Amino acid sequence: HWQCRWFQSTELAVTPIGERPVLLFVDTFSRYFEPENLRSAQRVLSAAGFTPFAPLPDQRSTKPLCCGRTHLSVGNVARARDTAQRLVETYAPYAAAGIPIVGLEPSCLLALKDEIPALLNTQDAQQVAKMVLTFEELLLTEKTALCLKPLQAKALLHGHCHQKAFGV
């Protein structure tokens, strides 16, 4: 159902803590339109033994971090580059430290993995791209504290269009 309470930056730690930190990318769509998905992801990550955090951007702007994909989609390459650069500058130190970057919105994650490295053509953008995982990839590839058991029922899965297009 519709949530009218946006996801606030104060809902997550802003620096890595604990033995298994994971950077949770709070994308614009999830922040404003499906904040409960972020809150649920935070609970699942914590239950799995991770300590999710979301770093704040520098003080150049009060705007939350964004991948810039929407700017690219309307041909505003300069603004997309500036938006992406701000994100990469914030995430690069964590990527260099080997901290996974996990998110919920496949189109934004694929922008981080594919479009931003091509757009910025920097070592930092490449390093960030290497650490990006979907929420599902993190839970499937990392050892977790979750005790998941196979369901004895059929389930339908509707994949995101960007996941299908990129074979994820």
Predicted segments with their positions:
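Iron-sulfur cluster-binding electron-transfer modules in prokaryotic oxidoreductases
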Residues: 1-168
